[in-house]
Structures are given as structure tokens and as C-alpha cells.
């Protein structure tokens, strides 16, 4: 029986496609706005929501999503309204989320069998419910970017100009922060907390080798991201290693190879 005939692998392929689409949109905004550190903070802060979910006996992905959105809003509010340095606000929510997650993990009776999959990702843990959640998040992200593309483009490259044009910058920033948090949490089953940030940045870096157009980077990063995921899933299956690490390893190797090829071609022109 071929591996692609197994339901868990089909879920992984579908999930990786949906994750690539969502991360293609959101990751391009993150890289353009230089919000990589914020996305890393939200990713690790979401561990607090996972711990709370496990401790209370509720769906840890849903509790992590709520916690991640709250953390994203907290960072945005502290850096804009309270005038706390953005990196300090990120560090605050990052470390607090991790501490809450660790405390809840130790206070939960018994053993947390899903903990490694949340940290490192696993194709075996992607369920139909995870696919539905990913599909919903992807649909919301794609809809928002389609409806507000010009506003998002203006905010991404020139926040001051966007405000001068009376665009709803603050509202859009909070909305995009929520979408960043939702996208991150919805991909945790695939790549895990430790490596989720790379799925939002490496495909965009690879696409940026060939184009500087915001729209084209989105399209290219979706295709590159899915190729990275498929290569990583194959490595994960053949070597029996965590899918998250395999996907990110494959994505960085592909990026390095393409960058080397581009440099070599340019050198010998």
C-alpha cells in the first residue's frame, strides 16, 4: 500500500497546502513590515494557551489561538498606546506565555502525550478537525487580503503615507496581528512552536531572490512553501523524524541552493 493512500498522509498534504497559502499571504506582510521578531514572540507565547487548554481539558489549539490573539493585541497595544518599546513588549508576552505553558503542563495530572507534536510538529497528529481549522483560517486570510489589498500594501511599505491617506491603519494593524496569531497557531500541528516562524519567512526570502513585487512574492511564496512542505514531509517519512524540523531543513536547503545558483549565474554572465 502506497504512503499517499493513508489518511494521515493525505491530511498532511492537504494541511501543508492550506498552511502554505495562509503563510504565503501573512508571511509576505510580516517580512515587508519587518515583524519577524513579533511573529516569533506570538509563536512562543501561544504555548501558554496550549498549557491552559490541556489543564482545563479543552481543545488546546483553540485555547492557544485565543491566547495568541490576546498576546498579539497586547504587544500592539503596549507598543502603540503605553509607549513600551516593541521588543520589550514582545519579550514580556513571549516569556510569560512560555512560563504559563510550563506551569500548566506540570500542574496537569498525568503525562502530556501531545506535547512533542506541539513543540516540533508531527504529520501523524494532523486530524480532520485541524484541516477544517486551517481551511477556515486560510479562507479568512485570503478574503481579507483580497478585499483590503491596497490598504495592506500601503501599510506594509509606508505606514505614515497610509495614515496621511486616511486609511484605517490602526484597525488594519490589529486585524493583521490577529490573522498572524491565527495563522501561526493553525500551523502548529505541522511544524510546531519551535519552528513555526520559519514557515512565515523562508519561502518569502526564497521568492525575494527572483521578484520584489508584493503580489508576486505572495504567489511565489505559496508555491515555494508547498514545495518545501512536500519535501519536508518526504524526509520526515523516510527518516522517521519530526515533520517540523524536516520541513524547515528542506526549505533552508532549497533557499541556499537557489541563492547559490543565482549568484553563480550572475557571476558568469
Language-model segments: residues:
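Transmembrane helix-bundle core of multi-pass membrane transporters
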Residues: 6-11, 82, 90-150
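Alpha-helical transmembrane segments in multi-pass membrane proteins
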Residues: 15-24, 45, 49, 53, ...
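Membrane-interfacial amphipathic/re-entrant helices at transmembrane-helix boundaries
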Residues: 1-21, 269
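Cytosolic-side transmembrane-helix boundaries in multi-pass membrane proteins
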Residues: 241-248, 252-269
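Hydrophobic alpha-helical transmembrane segments
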Residues: 13-18, 61-66, 91-92, 131-136, ...
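Helix-loop-helix "hairpin" substructures at the membrane interface of multi-pass membrane proteins
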Residues: 19, 130-203
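Transmembrane alpha-helical segments in multi-pass inner-membrane proteins
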Residues: 190, 194-245
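Short loop segments and helix-boundary regions at transmembrane helix junctions
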Residues: 28-111, 207-219, 236-239, 263-264
Amino acid at each position: 500500500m502506497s504512503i499517499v493512500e493513508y489518511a494521515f498522509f493525505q491530511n498532511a498534504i492537504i494541511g501543508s497546502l492550506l498552511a502554505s497559502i495562509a503563510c504565503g499571504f501573512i508571511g509576505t506582510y510580516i517580512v515587508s513590515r519587518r515583524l519577524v521578531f513579533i511573529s516569533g514572540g506570538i509563536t512562543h507565547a501561544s504555548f501558554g494557551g496550549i498549557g491552559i487548554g490541556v489543564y482545563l481539558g479543552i481543545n488546546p489549539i483553540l485555547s492557544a489561538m485565543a491566547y495568541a490573539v490576546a498576546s498579539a493585541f497586547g504587544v500592539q497595544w503596549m507598543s502603540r498606546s503605553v509607549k513600551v518599546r516593541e521588543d520589550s513588549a514582545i519579550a514580556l508576552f513571549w516569556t510569560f506565555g512560555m512560563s504559563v505553558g510550563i506551569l500548566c503542563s506540570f500542574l496537569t495530572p498525568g503525562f502530556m502525550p501531545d506535547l512533542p507534536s506541539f513543540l516540533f510538529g508531527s504529520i501523524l497528529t494532523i486530524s480532520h478537525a485541524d484541516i477544517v481549522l486551517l481551511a477556515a483560517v486560510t479562507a479568512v486570510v485570503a478574503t481579507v487580503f483580497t478585499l483590503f489589498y491596497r490598504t495592506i500594501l500601503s501599510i506594509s511599505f509606508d505606514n505614515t503615507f497610509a495614515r496621511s491617506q486616511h486609511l484605517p491603519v490602526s484597525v488594519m494593524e490589529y486585524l493583521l496581528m490577529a490573522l498572524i496569531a491565527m495563522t501561526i497557531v493553525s500551523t502548529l500541528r505541522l511544524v510546531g512552536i519551535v519552528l513555526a516562524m520559519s514557515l512565515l519567512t523562508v519561502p518569502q526570502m526564497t521568492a525575494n531572490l527572483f521578484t520584489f513585487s508584493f503580489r508576486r512574492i505572495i504567489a511565489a511564496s505559496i508555491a515555494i512553501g508547498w514545495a518545501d512542505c512536500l519535501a519536508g514531509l518526504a524526509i520526515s517519512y523516510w527518516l522517521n523524524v519530526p515533520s517540523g524540523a524536516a520541513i524547515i531543513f528542506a526549505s533552508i536547503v532549497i533557499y541556499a541552493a537557489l541563492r547559490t545558483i543565482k549568484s553563480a549565474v550572475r557571476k558568469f554572465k
